[in-house]
Amino acid sequence: MPAGGRAGSLKDPDVAELFFKDDPEKLFSDLREIGHGSFGAVYFARDVRNSEVVAIKKMSYSGKQSNEKWQDIIKEVRFLQKLRHPNTIQYRGCYLREHTAWLVMEYCLGSASDLLEVHKKPLQEVEIAAVTHGALQGLAYLHSHNMIHRDVKAGNILLSEPGLVKLGDFGSASIMAPANSFVGTPYWMAPEVILAMDEGQYDGKVDVWSLGITCIELAERKPPLFNMNAMSALYHIAQNESPALQSGHWSEYFRNFVDSCLQKIPQDRPTSEVLLKHRFVLRERPPTVIMDLIQRTKDAVRELDNLQYRKMKKILFQEAPNGPGAEAPEEEELTPCSQEAEPYTHRAGTLTSLESSHSVPSMSISASSQSSSVNSLADASDNEEEEEEEEEEEEEEEEEGPESREMAMMQEGEHTVTSHSSIIHRLPGSDNLYDDPYQPEMTPGPLQPPAAPPTSTSSSARRRAYCRNRDHFATIRTASLVSRQIQEHEQDSALREQLSGYKRMRRQHQKQLLALESRLRGEREEHSGRLQRELEAQRAGFGTEAEKLARRHQAIGEKEARAAQAEERKFQQHILGQQKKELAALLEAQKRTYKLRKEQLKEELQENPSTPKREKAEWLLRQKEQLQQCQAEEEAGLLRRQRQYFELQCRQYKRKMLLARHSLDQDLLREDLNKKQTQKDLECALLLRQHEATRELELRQLQAVQRTRAELTRLQHQTELGNQLEYNKRREQELRQKHAAQVRQQPKSLKVRAGQLPMGLPATGALGPLSTGTPSEEQPCSSGQEAILDQRMLGEEEEAVPERRILGKEGTTLEPEEQRILGEEMGTFSSSPQKHRSLANEEDWDISEEMKEIRVPSLASQERNIIGQEEAAAWSLWEKEGGNLVDVEFKLGWVQGPVLTPVPEEEEEEEEEGGAPIGTHRDPGDGCPSPDIPPEPPPSHLRQYPTSQLPGLLSHGLLAGLSFAVGSSSGLLPLLLLLLLPLLAAQGGGGLQAALLALEVGLVGLGASYLFLCTALHLPPGLFLLLAQGTALLAVLSLSWRRGLMGVPLGLGAAWLLAWPSLALPLAAMAAGGKWVRQQGPQMRRGISRLWLRILLRLSPMVFRALQGCGAVGDRGLFALYPKTNKNGFRSRLPVPWPRQGNPRTTQHPLAQLTRVWAVCKGWNWRLARASHRLASCLPPWAVHILASWGLLKGERPSRIPRLLPRSQRRLGLSASRQLPPGTVAGRRSQTRRTLPPWR
């Protein structure tokens, strides 16, 4: 599908092949409007090529959102081209003409919602099963090809002439599954479609949910939550439980089928293939169920159209004499042909109908637009009542004849005839548009033509034309239904635009989120690519460095190997040279030895001359051979030893060289490893930096997504709130119009008698009728007060609640004088009782009857958060589904009258306490001074102090200076006391005499104490001086504190601290630290206690119980760490930080320390008790009994501290506690009590 290009452009060959090039106005004739919806209109037409009856859906793609409309048309055409199934609508083609797409499909008689509209009652279960079976077969075909319909409802389940059930209106369908678009009709939407933008995608199971809602619609004539605003219904569907059948007469198979379709979790919901095997759709039923239903509906449509035609004929015949140039017609009996033609006269367009101005206004939405028309009652008696109401409305509207005639006049030009049910475009020159070659002609009967405008043809000719072709336009839609859809389409354009705008806004939000996510994904990919390139560059550099290092190491190894070989050759040559020298020396020595031995042998032979010469020669030869043999052996031994030595030295040298090479290799490997470690560290640091950068980027992106989602949610909530307010205004206006119409329909006798009300009868007060009977009595409603009642019922309950609180008891009324006083206090003046008396005081109709059809919806929880808690509390009054709204108002005392302003709660509390509110005037009776009585003069005995402050400043300065001097020299303390006493006495009012008396008393006391202590008690003078200084210090401090002379103790302290600087600085530091500890102490103490408890909880259970027995763990600490363990019920008492009441210094009281010591002792006592309990468990029973009788053993009370049991035991205990004991039955309270949700 092309994303760009203007609407209607066929430059793309894939788009151009979807549409035919022919002119549709030349191919199709006899166009008649048979339905209307948000997309446009649906027309009945005939193909001039083969006289085939078709349905044409005209969709305009001009105006606003033209590109979106064009894309929707392309998507629907592509979807229809792929359908090849008997239970889906057959596609004939699509044509373009003047920015309008003509989508040609096969013609069907009507939809399942038309059956409900015609019969005014639900379908039978066997009929619902047949319709559901056909729809399921179509859905199974779609789902097998990964298609989703997404708009399954009774208005889109069509019935054909052969009795086949077909799925239609594929404008919301999706070719690909899964999908995530917000598409469909609100009341039939599945929860996952509503939450698709937030929670993900959905598949074909959404059609199964819509089919379940459609079953409820066919069984109850309307879907659940239909009396609620569409926006509120979306929230209820997503949040509340699944709906179910209300009536109890349906079979268990049907209930199980609906419950299976309406499973809230999509995974638990069966597919269409599985539902085709359900017992509800497979059980036996007559094969002609659909045909019988269609035939019965046709008969009902014929009867309704006959009735409507008789009403129209009566109006035309009554108005005919008043027309210009019209003659009074004479009524005559209708022939059978004309009677059969009556129901189809409106659809054929042969009469200028006034039906458009006489239709009953409906609150429902058109079946082919957004929902089925279900604004009717459920039985045949209600149908008769509605027909009577229609007759009364038509009689009332007879007075508006001229305006109605102007609306029904035929338009000139193309001879377009405007009727209640169709708009027929007749081309000039075509006399008969209804000839059917496949239908026999009927002989027309005589019929008196009604009065018609001059531009129209004769009525008898049109009737004859219709009689010849009455069967070629078979339908199960009444003329009033088609007309009502046309009127609702014109009137409810704002509602459709609102809902389409809401869907468009949701789609735009989804596109915006997808665009944002794609942009952020691109940023992440770019960031990841940049980091990857950086990492690869670093790794490439590391590889280059490693290669250089490897080449260097290789060169070093080769150089060392060559050097080692050269050294080895030198070493071998050196050893070989030495061995050669040794061998040459040996050979020289052997030669010398040989010569010497030869001479010795010769000398020995010469000494023995008797030996023959031959023997001498032989003996000498043997001796020489022996000598040579010994020399050869000695040479061979030397060579062997040299070879061994050579090999040994070579092995040793090679070993030494191998060790050196190994050491070198180790050094090189260590260098290589160090280099690789450095590179890995740098790479790890780079990866950490990249990870941190990636984390920051993802965090920023998540924040951007969350901000966008929050903004889009805020806009969505604002839009929904605005739509709800508009819905309230629209319903209020409709209710006012309905009330006005009902008041106009009242008999004139009642209106006349309303003005003749006796004077003795009571009238309506400001807050309700003064003569209040029982709440169930019918209270008349005047036309002048309709706005007040409607406004009270439709949106201003929050003002009635304070009114009821003011009145006290519900339903009480006020006297006229009280009403006048309240009106003056609140700023509103109630009118006189005569003004509240209306013409409808004796009307005999009940408001509760009209309120049964109009229910004001209750808001969802999200909308309550938007509107506020006060408005949400007021809206809760509308959630009474089965009650009567007006009866509730009468019971609560909410009747017509001016709305009182609520009294603030603060003023009520003040009045209850008996005190006057702030701002009220006081009189002399309350203790206030009167302006007539002069104020009393001040008493004369009081001394008038001089205005000069110089003496006081001098005395304070003198005392401060003396105090500073006393701090450095403690011997001046008595002098300071002696000066302080007369100064304070002089300031007290005694003057100089009092000062002298105080000085004398001080000196006498000092002298007397000295005489008594030093003379009588023989106290040392030094000790007396120290005692006098201490007494004087205490006296000075007490007197200065009593008189407020803060300079004295401050001077003493400053001088003392300056005299001892080594002590002053630590004291200042301790003071600062104490202040910080005092501020941060509770928080630190809580943190340390929590840390201590966490450390204890990580220990084994045995150790924890031991510490718990020692008093190391208390209830308070555990409850502070685990607040929910101290709950008493289903709610947790979470600790809330609150300032402690009382003196914070009480925590350091000695009693607190004693309490802690007592807790530790108690813990050790508990430990001893446990040990004694274990010891007692080992004793025999008689010994335990004796110890218990002596008082040494006592029973043990269970502790409130939770035990740390294993998880398996806790689960077993929880499951065992939830199970009831065998043989017990749960009480009524436990059965009826609703399970509370877990505390969050």
UniProtKB/Swiss-Prot annotation:
GO terms for molecular function: ATP binding; mitogen-activated protein kinase kinase binding; neuropilin binding; protein serine kinase activity; protein serine/threonine kinase activity. It comes from the Eukaryota. The chain crosses the membrane at residues 972-992, 994-1014, 1019-1039, 1045-1065, 1175-1195. It catalyses: L-seryl-[protein] + ATP = O-phospho-L-seryl-[protein] + ADP + H(+); L-threonyl-[protein] + ATP = O-phospho-L-threonyl-[protein] + ADP + H(+). Residues 320-463, 899-946, 1212-1240 are annotated as: Disordered. Residues 381-401, 904-914 have a biased composition (Acidic residues). Its cofactor is Mg(2+). Serine/threonine-protein kinase involved in different processes such as membrane blebbing and apoptotic bodies formation DNA damage response and MAPK14/p38 MAPK stress-activated MAPK cascade. Phosphorylates itself, MBP, activated MAPK8, MAP2K3, MAP2K6 and tubulins. Activates the MAPK14/p38 MAPK signaling pathway through the specific activation and phosphorylation of the upstream MAP2K3 and MAP2K6 kinases. Interacts with MAP2K3 and MAP2K6. Self-associates. Interacts with tubulins. Interacts with MAP3K7 and interferes with MAP3K7-binding to CHUK and thus prevents NF-kappa-B activation. Isoform 2 interacts with PCDH8; this complex may also include CDH2. This is Serine/threonine-protein kinase TAO2. The gene is Taok2.
